[in-house]
Every structure is written in C-alpha cells, then in structure tokens.
Amino acid sequence: MTGHWIWKAAIAGFCGSAAHTLLMFLKSRFGLLPAFQPYESLQAALGHLTGGKVHPIVPWALSFLNGSTILGFCFGRVYPWLPGHSGAAKGVTFGIFGWAIMGFVFFPLLGLGLFATGLDLGIGPALFSLAMLLTYSVVLGVVYDALNPGVGK
C-alpha cells in the first residue's frame, strides 16, 4: 500500500460523511424519531465537559471531520482484512462494528443508555443509528474500493 491510501481514505471518508449528513437532514426534514437527537445529546455533553455553551455546529463538524479523517483512515488500514469481496460488503462489516461501539460505549457516555434505550423509544433509535452507520460505511467502502481497484479482494 503506497502513501496514496491516505488521500483515498480521506476522499472516501468525506463521501461517507456527506451521505451520513444527507440521511440526518432527511431525518430532520421528515420528522423521523424527533425525540432521538444524537447531535443535541453530544452538544449537551460537550457543554457539560467544557462548562459552557457549545454552538450546535460543533457536534456536526466533529462528526464530519471524524468521519472524513479518523474513521476513513482506520477503514483504509483495515480494508484488506475486512471480510467480503466488495467495498460495500467491507463497509457493512465496518459499519456493524462501529454501530456496536456507538451502542455499547458512545450512547451510554452521552447518558442515552445502551443503544439509546434510555430514551424509551423502543428499538427505533438503535435501528436508526444502524442505518446511520451503514449509510456512512457502505458509501465509504464503495468509494474506497473504486479508488483502490484490486486492493483487499
């Protein structure tokens, strides 16, 4: 793997983040699970940690930058070892792993409980968060695969 994988991972991560942002826009536009607002929960947690107000753009920017860089780079490094013969299949595996981390670690840290069950909304938040992660990771995988033909097949 040459040094070009970094830029390819960043481009794929950017595309995945853009797809995720579109899904979140549609969630808001169509009023899906209005009581499940993970970015507002993150904003509140950041405000609590810093002891001040946090602008609503901050959690969105952190998520977008994280998806475009850190997660994209992680995906680029583990891509050859992920199961599957396509970028989409590898993206699904990466997304399910990310969803498990979000459900078992991130949501509880935000005070939402395991898989956001503390919101008393049933399995809706868990399923939507799975859709969030799969939207990101499948696009990430497809774009990364297109930019790296023959790698990890």
Locate predicted features.
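Juxtamembrane/disordered regions of integral membrane proteins
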Residues: 1-153
